[in-house]
Regions:
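Bacterial N-terminal signal peptides that target proteins for export
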Residues: 1-8
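C-terminal motif of bacterial Sec signal peptides marking the signal peptidase cleavage site
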Residues: 17-20
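An aromatic- and glycine-enriched ligand-binding surface/loop that stacks and positions planar moieties
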Residues: 22-105, 208-209, 228-231, 236-415, ...
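Conserved, well-structured interaction surfaces
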Residues: 41-50, 54-60, 64, 89-177, ...
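Flexible, polar/acidic helix-loop-strand segments at domain edges
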Residues: 98, 105-110, 374-462, 695-708
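Short coil/turn linking the two alpha-helices of tandem helical-hairpin repeats
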Residues: 174-176, 181, 218, 237-249, ...
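Extended glycan-interaction surfaces of carbohydrate-active proteins
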Residues: 204-207, 213, 403-454, 526, ...
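Extended, compositionally biased alpha-helical segments that mediate assembly or anchoring
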Residues: 588-708
Length: 708
């Protein structure tokens, strides 16, 4: 069987080897001698594969799943998520599709100047640095090695994992750069860009081989590529191949594309999907259905949405049940522990003391109109996804909470909870509503020595994505399967406390995916590839304007779901343990409070609502100032109702009023939201290839400079 599979793979490589790129890749490609040495034994192959995993960890951390391009584009460029500071840097130009493809902004944008990324640190360089190494393995592992009685299974697994690694790298390259160079063997010398449709076809062929060679997923091997990962990646790539993307018309012939009827071409690029898109959905359906029905060591908790995130915050070595692939981090390690995701898009913290979580920047923030007006108040995911408080600790009284200042607190003890006010300070006490899914307070033992070393893993692929991808494919394939779409949509929908639904549509699935992955950076790409980006951006802009106009006119605005945002909210310092709560890190919001416009009736309720916040249970809370540490948490009132009189014992905080102020001062919340884009032009959601990547006669498309 392995012999047959490898034979198919070798034939496929011969047929689908594509003309590829230039000097940049040619000079970084390994030699034939190196390939022979690396694949001369199982140990040599495994060492090469292990090195690729380490390189992929760097790419995930620095560019495609935490920092870099993920931080610039995915984490903050949708109707749900946005950046928290003023639009004064290069990354914010990219967030808005370069002000709708403004020719001056697009043509002058560079990765080095606008994103501060050196040529050798770009996603392009990091991912293309991995691909030639994988070509060593796929070129060097022979049919005879696969069939070896003693070592054949090991060679087969490494071969399959190498195919998965190449496919993963190309998937990310296409997502961020569009049409790129294809290099699938050691003999490929880049001479031209290759249409992403041809690359997708090659990846699909490779993954059909890999899924039969990779080992079965178990609870213990989720940090490596497995059979279930190969199937899920095949489904993910097939979905994207079927989807709307912005294509260079000088690379992909227009006859192969079906243009989106609502979007105009721009900069010799068109927003379209392949004419045979349904065939890709057929492939996605089969692949994702396999994983859904054969999850191996992955397990979906159908009752509790928080299980996955609780497990992510476990001790080193803890892998979430729902994960299919996690990038592992080790707490405190300067190499594997340098995890950027909790820092970049986690719950914000400003701290300068060992008795508090380390600084978390919290660059990705939640659009307030989405939080208030789009999330169903009954949805259990809202308060896990979106958080209105951060952690704060600084010596002295600068920025200290009013109640602590009055109590004479000197700022030298433990972290305390603060409101994330709507100012331009991206930190533990500003820039508005943030993502609450990655919160170092929730770790069993937070790391306090240095920021960015929490050890929290990065969840790259999990079952809920498989389920919702399957629901999408079921609706869009050649012969739609409504029953399967309903079944897998309802697995996540019901878990969120929203019951079940029949006859779901593609837009239902896209929206469900938005709620399921809110604050995780999935939304932007999902809206782009499903064709809903213009509709959803227009809707959130209109809702934001209504909110701001209402706040200006009346001091409050009430949304259709019953939630009200007012000019002010009110807080009070509390000690949860003195109120009978078991922890300072609060539980999910009690279901009885998950209704539109809920107002807490007691201080205890105001501490529990909204849930999933608070502070870590530092032992020092019990000993500081003879056991009289100032109150660590806050009770909140007026978050979803309009209260005009300050409740007894509470302090008033500008809330909606601060949104209006920022809009009047710098246009941040409405005017800058996808500033300049008309929701009708092909979205330029990509970034240019940097100068070194274009050596050899290549040119950027989409209006970007080519350094010529």
């Amino acid at each position: 069987m392995r012999n047959k599979i490898l034979g198919i793979a070798l034939c496929t490589t011969a047929v689908l080897s594509l003309n590829s790129c230039g000097d940049y890749l040619e000079t970084s490609s390994p030699s034939t001698v190196t390939a022979q040495l690396a694949t001369s034994s199982v140990d040599g192959c495994q060492t090469t594969m292990d090195g690729a995993y380490e390189s992929f960890h760097v790419a995930l951390r620095d560019q495609i799943f935490a920092n870099g391009l993920f931080y610039t584009l995915d984490a903050a460029g949708s109707d749900i998520e946005r950046h928290g500071g003023e639009q004064n840097t290069g990354r914010l130009k990219a967030e808005t599709f370069y002000n709708g493809g403004n020719s001056e902004i697009v043509s002058t944008f560079t990765v080095l100047q606008d994103l501060g990324t050196a040529d050798d640190k770009t996603a392009f360089a990091l991912l293309y640095g991995i691909i030639p190494t994988m070509n060593i393995l796929t070129d060097g592992i022979s049919e005879e090695m696969i069939e070896d009685e003693k070592y054949g299974e090991s060679f087969a697994e490494i071969y399959g994992q190498a195919l998965c690694m190449k496919a993963t790298c190309y998937r990310e390259l296409i997502k961020y750069y569009g049409d790129v160079m294809a290099v699938f063997t050691l003999n490929d010398i880049p001479t031209a860009f290759t249409s992403r449709l041809d690359i997708y076809d090659k990846l699909i062929a490779d993954l059909n081989v890999a899924k039969e060679l990779c080992p079965e997923l178990t609870p213990l091997n989720k940090t490596k590529f497995t059979k279930q990962y190969a199937y899920a990646l095949l489904g993910r790539i097939a979905l994207e191949a079927a989807s709307y993307q912005t294509y260079r018309l000088d690379v992909t012939d227009a006859s192969r594309l079906e243009k989106h009827p609502e979007y105009s071409d721009i900069n010799n690029a068109t927003y379209a999907r392949p004419t045979n898109y349904k065939s890709y959905y057929d492939i996605a359906y089969d692949a994702l259905k396999y994983v859904a029905e054969n999850p191996g060591g992955a397990k979906f908790d159908a009752n509790d949405y928080t299980t996955f995130f609780t497990q992510l915050h476990g001790e080193d070595g803890c892998i979430a049940d729902e994960s299919i692939f996690e990038d592992e981090n080790v707490q405190g390690s300067s190499t594997t522990g340098n995890c950027e995701r909790p820092y970049a898009i986690g719950r914000p913290a400003t701290s300068s003391n060992k008795f508090g979580v380390c600084k978390s920047y919290g660059q990705a923030r939640i659009n307030p109109a989405f939080y208030y007006g789009v999330f169903d108040p009954k949805d259990k995911r809202r308060d896990i996804s979106c958080v209105v408080t951060g952690s704060y600790l600084k010596a002295g009284t600068a920025g200290i909470r009013d109640d602590l200042k009055e109590a004479g607190y000197d700022g030298k003890g433990c972290c305390y909870e603060v409101i994330l006010g709507f100012n331009m300070k991206t930190s533990g006490d500003g820039a508005g509503i943030a993502c609450g899914k990655f919160d170092e307070n929730r770790q069993v033992k937070p790391y306090t020595v240095k920021q960015r070393m929490s050890g929290i893993n990065s969840p790259y692929l999990r079952l809920s994505e498989v389920y919702l991808g399957l629901a999408e494919a079921a609706l869009m394939k050649s012969s739609p399967d409504q029953s399967t779409a309903d079944t897998y949509y309802n697995l996540t929908h019901k878990r969120a406390g929203l019951g079940t639904k029949s006859g779901v549509t593609l837009e239902d699935v896209v929206d469900e995916r938005g709620f399921e992955f809110a604050g995780e950076g999935d939304r932007r790409w999902t809206l782009i590839r499903t064709g809903f980006i213009g509709k959803k951006v227009k809707a959130i802009k209109e809702l934001t304007k209504k909110m701001i106009d209402g706040l200006k006119a009346n001091g409050y605005y009430t949304f259709e779901n019953g939630n009200t945002i007012g000019n002010y909210i009110y807080y009070k310092g509390v000690d949860p343990t003195a109120m009978g709560m078991s922890s300072r890190v609060t539980a999910p919001t009690p279901e009885s409070m998950l209704v539109g416009g809920y107002e807490p009736k007691t201080d205890l309720e105001a501490t529990q609502f909204p849930g999933w916040r608070g502070q870590h249970d530092w032992n020092e809370y019990k000993t500081y100032q003879n056991g009289k540490f100032p109150n660590s948490n806050i009770a909140i009132k007026g978050l979803f109702t309009n209260i005009t009189d300050t409740p007894a014992g509470y302090y008033k905080k500008d809330w909606g009023k601060a949104i209006v102020k920022q809009e009047e001062t710098n246009g941040f919340y409405y005017e800058d939201l996808f500033k300049g884009w008309d929701c009708q032009s092909a979205p330029i959601y990509l970034v240019p290839i940097s100068q070194n990547g274009l050596i050899g006669g290549f040119t950027n498309g989409y209006g970007f400079t080519s350094f010529n």
